[in-house]
Regions:
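Bacterial N-terminal signal peptides that target proteins for export
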Residues: 1-8
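C-terminal motif of bacterial Sec signal peptides marking the signal peptidase cleavage site
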Residues: 16-19
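Proteolytic-maturation and junctional protease-sensitive modules
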Residues: 124-192
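Proteolytic processing hotspots in large secreted/extracellular or virion-associated proteins
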Residues: 39, 43-56, 101-154
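N-terminal low-complexity, Pro/Thr/Ser-rich intrinsically disordered segments
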Residues: 27-74
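Self-processing/autoproteolytic domain segments and adjacent N-terminal interaction modules in large
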Residues: 54-128
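Bacterial signal peptide processing site
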Residues: 21-24
Length: 193
């Protein structure tokens, strides 16, 4: 009797797994397109890209972008400006770009200024993407002038990576720093290291 109950339970589990898409590592559900009776594939849906509500957002498409245009995205605090230069052919693809201050700042990131660039596609398709930070501080930076770095947060560890720096202006207490920002992620300024 116990064997029959066990067998019935095992078969029920197998049917349930098959109906739910099996035990793959993609969170359940079928991950491959399913064929219907006419032989055409039905694509799987992916989550839509969105910006956090307090970030600034810019949407681009092939039909609305002109060649070699400089487009600016500025945070409400006026400190961060992301300047995107469109390609010479004007073709950007459909693209959403976000700029803002993460709240809260990810654990382990220690910096005086932290801004995040998010993109639904590759910013390397643009002619350039530059982040400029304009701020006033009474802290004496070390090194001076300070620089913008990329904070790579992975596996609970934070690695600060150097970036190609642009023009900077450093006359205390006013600072303007610029750096290439063609990757989605956190851009930071550490006034003291």
């Amino acid at each position: 009797m116990k064997k029959k109950i066990f067998l019935a339970g095992l078969m029920g589990s197998a049917v349930l797994l098959a109906a739910c898409g099996g035990g793959d590592d993609n969170g359940g559900g079928a991950s491959a397109p399913a064929a219907n009776s006419t032989g055409t594939a039905t694509p799987t849906t992916t989550a839509a890209f969105s910006c956090p509500s307090d970030y600034k957002k810019m949407s681009l498409s092939n039909s609305s972008v002109i060649a070699n245009a400089n487009l600016n995205l500025r945070t409400d605090d006026g400190i961060a400006v992301l300047t995107i230069k469109t390609p010479a052919d004007g073709k950007t693809g459909d693209l959403i770009i976000c700029l803002g201050k993460p709240n809260p700042v990810p654990a382990g990131v220690k910096a005086d200024y932290v801004y995040e660039v998010k993109s639904s596609s590759d910013l390397h398709a643009m002619a350039s993407s530059t982040l400029t930070l304009n701020f006033t501080t009474n802290t004496v930076p070390n090194p001076n002038p300070p620089v913008i770095e990329f904070a790579d947060v992975s596996n609970g560890a934070v690695t600060y990576k150097s970036l190609t720096q642009g023009a900077s202006y450093a006359t205390a207490p006013n600072y303007t720093l610029a750096a290439s920002a063609q990757d989605s992620g956190l851009y930071v300024v550490r006034l003291t290291k």
